[in-house]
């Protein structure tokens, strides 16, 4: 019997994870990263129902420093971040994981839909996609290292969402019914309103321009646009145009025809490998957005922590700031943050 710490939010996934760990006969305690009283109360209610010791870590300061601050800064710089990447790397599998181990946990369990297994060849733990491709969350976990993977339990990785809900309901768990929103700290996932309230003074109107620098109109501020956007531009040009990029020096949003959104390659930075670093030209599948389909590509590592990825076919709207995760079959090779697209 092992001691297992469960990261508990009070939602159906983490609540069912706690249930499964208890049913497996482990000594279980729960940990909650609290950014507000509501989250702490919901998690405490579930933990009490299951009869498990519960601990709350107030990470509001760290959350501001490691997640919200960089999120805002990225948008101000014309990048489109995925805050879940930083939250999982630095907080859930950083601060929370370390606290769990310090308090005696042999293993750390979460409600993520992914799988972990040890493979004798290459002699390490590997991260795999979930059995249910509709719920797979391996994309946001590519920064996990061997220390964490060796202690990680992901009991939902072999289950469907429907099965998880059925288990929770059958047990009578008082879980939070609502599905998690895409950005947990942004009401209604309306990031534009959030940015305007948080850093409106740093947002300035500027010109829409084409590739030649011709002014086509005025925009409301670089953070309110993302690569590939067509709607909401307010341009009446007699032809459809899309956001292609940004010119920070001119505070300009570059727009143009859709065909200019397609690129065959990109550069990634802050690259981390779970499998051994591949040789240059290794065939992989690269996933450039959370719900995008991974596409065949060649991976060219550029030590110490960058990589160039070349697709077999051009991809639409490769977006700086988004994570790019590299797969071979169902195994996660590694991943990084898109720096720029390359034709």
From Swiss-Prot:
Main location, first listed in the record: cytoplasm
Binding-site residues for ATP, renumbered to this chain: 7-14, 33, 111
Listed GO biological process terms: tRNA wobble position uridine thiolation
Entry-linked Pfam families: tRNA_Me_trans, tRNA_Me_trans_C, tRNA_Me_trans_M
Region annotated Interaction with tRNA, chain positions: 135-137, 289-290
NCBIfam families recorded: PRK00143.1, trmU
EC code: 2.8.1.13
Gene Ontology molecular function terms on file: ATP binding; tRNA binding; tRNA-uridine 2-sulfurtransferase activity
Active site as annotated: 87, 184
Keyword line: ATP-binding, Cytoplasm, Disulfide bond, Nucleotide-binding, RNA-binding, Transferase, tRNA processing, tRNA-binding
Designated name of the protein: tRNA-specific 2-thiouridylase MnmA
Annotated site location: Interaction with tRNA: 112, 322
GO cellular component annotations of the record: cytoplasm
Function statement: Catalyzes the 2-thiolation of uridine at the wobble position (U34) of tRNA, leading to the formation of s(2)U34.
Family matches, as InterPro entries: MnmA-like, MnmA-like_C, MnmA-like_central, MnmA-like_central_sf, Rossmann-like_a/b/a_fold
Gene that encodes the chain: mnmA
């Amino acid at each position: 019997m092992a001691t297992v710490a469960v990261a508990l939010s009070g939602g159906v996934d983490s609540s069912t994870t706690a249930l499964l760990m208890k049913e497996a006969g482990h000594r279980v305690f729960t940990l909650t990263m609290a950014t507000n009283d509501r989250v702490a109360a919901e998690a405490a209610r579930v933990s009490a129902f299951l009869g498990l010791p519960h601990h709350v870590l107030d990470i509001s300061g760290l959350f501001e420093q490691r997640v919200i601050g960089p999120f805002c800064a990225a948008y101000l710089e014309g990048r489109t971040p995925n805050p879940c990447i930083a939250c999982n790397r630095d907080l859930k599998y950083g601060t929370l994981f370390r606290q769990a181990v310090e308090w005696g946990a042999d293993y750390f369990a979460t409600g993520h839909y992914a799988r972990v297994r040890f493979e004798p060849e290459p002699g390490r733990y590997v991260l795999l996609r979930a059995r249910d491709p509709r719920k797979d969350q391996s994309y946001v976990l590519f920064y996990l290292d061997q220390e964490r993977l060796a202690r990680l339990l992901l009991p939902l990785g072999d289950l469907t969402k429907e099965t998880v809900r059925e288990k929770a309901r059958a047990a009578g768990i008082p879980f939070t019914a609502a599905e998690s929103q895409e950005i947990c700290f942004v009401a209604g996932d309306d990031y534009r309103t959030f940015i305007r309230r948080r850093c409106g003074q740093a947002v300035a109107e500027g010109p829409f321009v084409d590739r030649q620098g011709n002014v086509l109109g005025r925009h409301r501020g670089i953070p309110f646009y993302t690569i590939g956007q067509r709607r909401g531009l307010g341009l009446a040009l007699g032809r459809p145009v899309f956001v292609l990029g940004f010119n920070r020096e001119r505070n300009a949003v570059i727009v143009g025809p859709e065909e200019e959104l397609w690129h065959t390659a990109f550069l990634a930075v802050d690259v981390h490998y779970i499998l051994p670093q591949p040789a240059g030209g290794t065939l992989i599948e690269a996933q450039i957005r959370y719900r995008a389909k991974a596409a065949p590509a060649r991976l060219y590592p550029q030590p110490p922590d960058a990589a160039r990825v070349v697709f077999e076919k051009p991809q639409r709207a490769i977006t700086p700031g988004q994570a790019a995760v590299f797969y071979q079959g169902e195994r996660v090779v590694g991943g990084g943050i898109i720096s720029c697209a390359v034709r």
